Regions:
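Transmembrane-helix exit segments and adjacent C-terminal regions of multi-pass membrane proteins
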Residues: 1-6, 182-187, 240, 256, ...
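12-transmembrane solute porter fold
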Residues: 2-20, 43, 237-246, 253, ...
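Extracellular/periplasmic helix-loop-helix junction of adjacent transmembrane segments
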Residues: 21-52, 315-319
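Membrane-interface helix termini in secondary transporters
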Residues: 24, 55-59, 63, 148, ...
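Cytoplasmic loop-to-transmembrane helix junctions
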Residues: 38, 123-130, 316, 404-411, ...
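Central cavity-lining transmembrane alpha-helices of secondary-active solute carriers
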Residues: 43-58, 108-113, 322-335
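Helix-loop-helix hairpins in multi-pass membrane proteins, especially solute transporters
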Residues: 62-200
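Hydrophobic transmembrane-helix bundles of small-molecule transporters
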Residues: 152-284, 471
Length: 512
């Protein structure tokens, strides 16, 4: 079980590890920083594959056997890590990240199921909670881990590759350990595929991919040629002309998925849970907090990349994110103690307000000449998020009957990840569109016929410093304002969750 938890931790670390190393990655791969709607897929590719893998691999483990399925997921994660480490184009990197994400996402539900199988019915709840906590710790420390590794290998060319190369020996050791354990374990039928909800997983994948393609590409929709980001040296997004069709495909796939899951004898998702109001509230809250978390994890390194020397980006990004991640972790640990003293409704409502205030402070206090002005907002926002996460993970387990607790825990995490991927796609699109609007009057950077290369590059650099960077930072500040609004929007759902927990406490600990 310890080896399985190590695998889950590694998979969740890679969820956010690119946050601090993304600027270096796109620079080494020759991607223009203006093409954010393209390179954001190094994040989205992992998240979408991770989400799809959770219900699919979880179901396969029921049919094929836990250990065998876990080893397959581990091998997929290993293959993705190697592909990321050797990628020489953005497309290859995105494919590698997607393969990684599918393997990493598959590790989580199998580990949760293993915890239930190993610990028995009495220890099931604690085991599921512990696996979920390990997964949360992983994506919290991911950006810091990425920066530490790139600093350790700073003398090497393209040190970010070592973040993925170091996965290989660790995974090989874990494979040997787990393979020995799997030999002594029973396995399921090799005809497992007959019992899989293939239409369900297909519709879920189509809905996620098309929705995110549309959202991430929406910033350029309707923009004139040579304006906005294109004036800053970015390239045309070929999908921008197909956004209505992509959105239509996403809506149709989602509707068909809901209809299919209602009628399926072996649904991909635990349909009965979705009828319960506390679970519905956790879906909304997890979607919102996922978006808020990812805005912070991605945009802080982007601010640093825009205003700092390239060699210092990873270190400074991790240094700034450290207070945020520490605050999230510390508040998560304190949440249970605080809930013993205070009403859960007021505690969670206060946490929402803290998350919103933190995002507001980042937007209002950000100073490109002094990055430390970000820290107060990061700490306050981290405390708010940390106080929310335990409740959002435990309520689905409390609602579900013992047979469905693993599926409930996986579903809660899946919707948080869905919030991350939709949030980063939608806010990226809004940011690009806003930047298009702000920079619409800028003349494109075009080399004159008789202009020397040195003169053109100098003019381009001046343009970037005087126009592109200030406008980009302004837009990023505005995304934090949107994040604050998203945080406040989940207040009704959070209040319902707090009310449910308070009611359960009253039943379990009746007044004297």
């Amino acid at each position: 079980m310890v080896a399985a938890l190590c695998c889950v931790l590694l998979g969740s670390i890679d969820l956010t590890v690119v946050a601090s190393i993304l600027p270096g990655m796109i620079g080494d791969l020759g991607v223009n920083t203006a093409d954010i709607d393209r390179y954001i897929w190094a994040v989205n590719g992992y998240l979408i594959a991770y989400i799809v893998a959770i219900p699919l691999i979880g179901r396969i483990s029921d049919l094929l056997g836990r250990q065998r399925t876990f080893l397959i997921a581990l091998l997929i994660f290993l293959a993705g890590s190697v592909l990321c480490a050797t990628a020489d184009t953005l497309g290859t990197l995105v494919v590698g990240r997607a393969i990684q994400g599918f393997g990493g996402g598959g590790l989580l539900p199998v580990a949760i199921a293993l915890a239930g199988d190993t610990l028995g019915r009495r220890g099931q709840l604690a085991g599921i909670g512990f696996v979920s906590a390990i997964e949360t710790i992983g994506w919290i420390v991911g950006p810091i881990y990425g920066a530490v590794i790139t600093n350790l290998f700073a003398g090497q060319d393209e040190p970010w590759r070592w973040v993925f190369w170091l996965n290989v020996p660790v995974l090989l050791v874990l494979l040997v350990v787990l393979r020995g354990f799997a030999r002594s374990s029973s396995t399921g039928s090799l005809r497992f595929w007959r019992h899989l909800d293939i239409p369900g997983i297909g519709l879920l994948t189509i809905a996620l991919v098309t929705a995110n393609l549309a959202l991430a590409s929406g910033g350029e929709f309707g923009a004139a040629t040579g304006t906005g980001l294109r004036a800053m040296g970015g390239t045309h997004n070929p999908l921008s002309s197909y956004i209505p069709l992509l959105l239509l495909a996403a809506v149709i796939a989602t509707v068909l998925l809901v209809l299919w899951e209602r009628r399926s004898s072996e649904p991909l998702l635990p349909v009965s849970l979705y009828r319960q109001r506390p679970f519905q509230a956790t879906i909304i809250a997890n979607l919102c907090i996922g978006a808020v978390l990812m805005v912070t994890m991605v945009n802080v390194p982007v601010i640093v990349a825009l205003t700092t020397d390239a060699d210092d980006v990873a270190t400074l990004s991790a240094t700034l994110l450290a207070p945020y991640t520490i605050a999230v972790a510390a508040a998560s640990l304190l949440a249970s103690r605080l809930s013993d003293r205070w009403s859960e409704r007021y505690l969670l409502a206060g946490a929402v307000i803290l998350a919103a205030v933190g995002a507001l402070l980042i937007a209002l206090l950000q100073d490109r000449d002094n990055h430390w002005t970000l820290v107060p907002g990061l700490v306050i926002g981290g405390i708010g998020a940390g106080l929310l996460l335990p409740a959002l993970g435990t309520v689905p387990i409390m609602v579900a009957d013992p047979r469905h607790r693993g599926g409930a825990a996986s579903s809660a995490l899946m919707f948080r990840l869905l919030g991350m991927t939709i949030g980063v796609s939608a806010l990226t699109s809004l940011a690009v569109r806003r930047l298009q609007s702000l920079s619409n009057q800028l003349e494109p950077i075009v080399r004159e016929p008789d202009e020397s290369t040195a003169s053109f590059l100098a003019r381009q650099q001046t343009f970037i410093l005087d126009h592109a960077i200030p406008l980009s930072i302004q837009v990023i500040e505005e995304t934090f304002l949107v994040a604050a609004v998203i945080a406040i929007a989940m207040l009704p759902a959070i209040w319902l969750i707090g009310k449910f927990i308070d009611h359960r406490h009253e039943i379990e600990v009746p007044a004297d």
